[in-house]
Amino acid sequence: MDFSKLPKILDEDKESTFGYVHGVSGPVVTACDMAGAAMYELVRVGHSELVGEIIRLEGDMATIQVYEETSGVSVGDPVLRTGKPLSVELGPGIMGAIFDGIQRPLSDISSQTQSIYIPRGVNVSALSRDVKWEFTPSKNLRVGSHITGGDIYGIVNENSLIKHRIMLPPRNRGTVTYIAPPGNYDTSDVVLELEFEGVKEKFSMVQVWPVRQVRPVTEKLPANHPLLTGQRVLDALFPCVQGGTTAIPGAFGCGKTVISQSLSKYSNSDVIIYVGCGERVNEMSEVLRDFPELTMEVDGKVESIMKRTALVANTSNMPVAAREASIYTGITLSEYFRDMGYHVSMMANSTSRWAEALREISGRLAEMPADSGYPAYLGARLASFYERAGRVKCLGNPEREGSVTIVGAVSPPGGDFSDPVTSATLGIVQVFWGLDKKLAQRKHFPSVNWLISYSKYMRALDEYYDKHFTEFVPLRTKAKEILQEEEDLAEIVQLVGKASLAETDKITLEVAKLIKDDFLQQNGYTPYDRFCPFYKTVGMLSNMIAFYDLARRAVETTAQSDNKITWSIIREHMGEILYKLSSMKFKDPVKDGEAKIKADYAQLLEDVQNAFRSLED
């Protein structure tokens, strides 16, 4: 296969910007004659023009981490400096695409090379220059208007789900001297021309942004709207907000990937950026296979989920260094859509692999290792990544709000949560969904351990719940109490058996079992249970807690009388009711609809109350 006809880099070809390779150690290359280079500057190494980034400067020597396989690079090979940092292209064409860690479009490379492998040093622009997009300028913008960074000056309907708002890059401003009329343009055509202090500047629909730099915002806002995931255990007990940070640590086979994929499929976000960094390739191929087939209903129209998703896939034949780049590429894409006023969710699967890449690079640079060989700055790197989440007031006009929610999967070796990456992550994130190996072995999925998980957003969401689901907060508190009590009783039951427990404790055990098996457990592969809307979650919990309260009251009020009501009597008389309670989850929100499900649950509550009345009479 002849790769020589593929495009090469076109940035700068001046002889003065060349250095020379001095030494090669895996993905780390040292180069000399690099005086005047900057930290994190993008370079091209060797005759194949491999992409690299400067990570250390000493005198005229530069240490470069290379994002491609370095075999064949020899001492004395040229190192071309590009004079700019590692950046991504932001513009129409991102949605539905799949990029590698340094934003090379994998499908375009595949069609150009006719090969399943990525050739080294390939240089394909991230956003296709051949596709024409229909550009509509903003109504209130004309020649002579003043415009500043972040202002929306046009709209491109990227697909039926995403209106791509074309914004002025944050650092530019000026007076409009030309704006393109409505029509079809490709991403290299000039659609806007500004004049500022006598200097004219032309803009296309694409802006370039350095990945390590946070995109500016007007102000950060407190997050107060829940990120509804469709998973009952997460929405009810450990909610996350739009603009929050979440960690999902869990051992191999606990279901981290299924949770992050179901978040991508069913959460109430407008845009999903899914970063697979260093995980197994079959997980990314599963995403690629499933997502185009998955649909969601928007205003009565069925749409493919891929239309609101961009994938950043670190292919397995890329060296470890690229894992770091893929995390930054993903978060920069997320911030760009946030600036348009969208609510974005970014899934990073898995941040442990990224930390391992940091460890390897740090080892090759001979830095002092800290805990488990990870570098001492691991916590700071993780924090700088998670801090880019949040709900914000976006820069520019018209006024708009956007948010970035980060969900990071962590894979501690052997499921050990005291691992440095897990403990550093838990110090930063606000929501912790801890997955339990024992639950996974019992086939209880999602295997979120309700005793060790927590969410620090409970208070922030109280206002939302009071407004929309007034009865929910006390229900959640009661459910947590029941689950905690059941855990305390489990030890006693093992010693003395169930029979010798108090009647109220027997009720607690049975209702806890009901909550665990028929509320917290959820089968992600069935049409009725793969996604649970919040009204259904509240309805189910409400009926279970109502049964618990009525059963306890019946037992306590008749404890002193002659015809005592015990748990065995309740169970005998209410087999039908218990069966109905445990089969509440089989209502299909798509087929049955909200009104019918709510009516059925209300009817069941009435049946429960009537059954207890007749029992007491």
Curated annotation (Swiss-Prot):
Pfam families per UniProt: ATP-synt_ab, ATP-synt_ab_N, ATP-synt_ab_Xtn, ATP-synt_VA_C
Residues carrying Phosphoserine: S384
Question: In what way does this protein cross or attach to the membrane?
Answer: Peripheral membrane protein
Instruction: Name the enzyme group at the top EC level.
Output: translocase
Per the record, the domain of life is: Eukaryota
Q: Does this UniProt record's set of keywords contain Translocase? A: yes
Q: Which SUPFAM superfamilies does this one have? A: C-terminal domain of alpha and beta subunits of F1 ATP synthase, N-terminal domain of alpha and beta subunits of F1 ATP synthase, P-loop containing nucleoside triphosphate hydrolases
Q: Which GO terms describe its molecular function?
A: ATP binding; ATP hydrolysis activity; proton-transporting ATPase activity, rotational mechanism
Q: Which GO terms describe its cellular component?
A: clathrin-coated vesicle membrane; cytoplasm; cytosol; lysosome; plasma membrane; transport vesicle; vacuolar proton-transporting V-type ATPase, V1 domain
Q: Which reaction does it catalyse?
A: ATP + H2O + 4 H(+)(in) = ADP + phosphate + 5 H(+)(out)
Sites of Phosphothreonine modification: T136
* Gene3D superfamilies in UniProt: 2.40.30.20, 2.40.50.100, Bovine Mitochondrial F1-atpase, Atp Synthase Beta Chain, Chain D, domain 3, P-loop containing nucleotide triphosphate hydrolases
Q: What does this protein do?
A: Catalytic subunit of the V1 complex of vacuolar(H+)-ATPase (V-ATPase), a multisubunit enzyme composed of a peripheral complex (V1) that hydrolyzes ATP and a membrane integral complex (V0) that translocates protons. V-ATPase is responsible for acidifying and maintaining the pH of intracellular compartments and in some cell types, is targeted to the plasma membrane, where it is responsible for acidifying the extracellular environment.
Record-given protein name: V-type proton ATPase catalytic subunit A
